[in-house]
Amino acid sequence: RSVPGISVIDSSPEFSLNQLEIIPEENSIDFGKLLYGGSETEITYKLPVNLLSKHTLLSGINGTGKTNTVQAILNKLSEKVPFLVIEPAKTEYIDWAIEYNKRHPDNVISIFIPGCKSYKDKTNRQDIKIAPLKLNPFDIVWLEKEQESNVLTHIDRLKSTFAAAFPMYDILPVLMEDLIYTVYQNNTTDWLTKEPVFGRTLPPTLNSMSLAVNEVIANRQYEERVERNMKACLNTRIDSLKRGWKGEMLNTIYSTPWSELFEKPCVINLSYVGDDTDKSFFMALILQFLYEYCTAKAELGLIDFNDNGCKHLTVVEEAHRVMMKCDNLELPQYKSAMMFSNMLSEIRAYGEGMLLVDQVPTRLIPDAIKNTNIKITHRLVAEDDCKAIGEAMGINKEQRKIIPKLLVGQCIISTALSTDEHWIKVKKVK
């Protein structure tokens, strides 16, 4: 038993002390030191960078070291592999990126904070000017003339994104679909009845959508009271996206160049977005454009499908906002979650790795657990979370008991390269 000054703990289950087999010339990340019985060894755990293209799930309750673990990966990646971080809350990645940019002026990380024009550096208290982020939901990822515009597939994804972010009932989802198709057939933004011209046919905007509401509702020939209610519902949802800085970001013709977002190190922070529904919408929109950018590059032959390496990594913090587990098949949220589930399955072929971060793994869609080849867990305390992640990682019941007792910075990791699991102390990022 414990006495003052001396603590007694149960014997720790054993985890592997064997390193992963890595080709000497392969790029890898010095992840941290292996632990034996909770004590740090001199054995360094190295994680192959190319393995990240097979997706990663990182879980752990608040304050256990998840952000530090991600930053340890990004510090190494930034030398050769671009990345995108979508941060819905807090500003830890912004502060990290600012310090990184001071040390690496030749390879700076782009920082976007919608709703914020200047950010105070917490080290020297100076204001840093923040470039505006522009994202037109109706924009088409059309990189070169030889590529197909693929407007119909964009519309299908966009209507799912709208429906999931702004709950709509009865006939409203159908009206929203009609509205989206209508704005793509305007005289100046006609992508459907005429052949669009590369670089000349402009995408619709939220203003176009507002102007089309009356036309779409009138064509349905509802009685006056119903027509009035339908117009009010649609206009309320559209107008909410046109107000203030949201309008500056979304109600625009031209989006921020895709290469700025998806070809260079980039952090998008959504902490100034107060509404959770808006955060989910913005995150879904960014991921939708990311997927379309990957498919566009593939159409142009810019992706080597024989190369299984990681060409780009996307970190999705609070992943449940776009991949929430939903058991009701009729809800739009379920369809949206399935869209991103399919994206998770397909995007790996383009060399795109997804790093999903969440405090509660059981609230994510099943594919977030099943379809990630790297699983990292920090401390979890709920029994159902420990069981779900433990079974997915293939650890036994005795090993699972250590998950609620992990100290800050400690984690258990399993990968597709080994049948063993490793207990690691992740090195602290400066």
Which residues are covered by each model-predicted region?
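Basic- and hydrophobic-enriched, low-structure N-terminal and domain-boundary segments
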Residues: 1-61, 68-73, 308-310, 328
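Short gly/ser/thr-rich secondary-structure transition/capping motifs
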Residues: 37-43, 249-251, 296, 357
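Alpha-helix capping and helix-loop boundary segments enriched in small/acidic/polar residues
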Residues: 46, 61-68, 146-149, 310, ...
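Short acidic loop-to-helix transition motifs that present clustered carboxylates
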Residues: 52, 62, 90-91, 275, ...
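Conserved beta-strand position immediately N-terminal to the Walker
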Residues: 56, 266, 355
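Conserved ATP-driven motor cores of ASCE-family P-loop NTPases powering translocation/secretion/packaging/pilus
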Residues: 72-75, 99, 335-429
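P-loop NTPase motor domains
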Residues: 74-82, 86-345, 349-352, 406-419
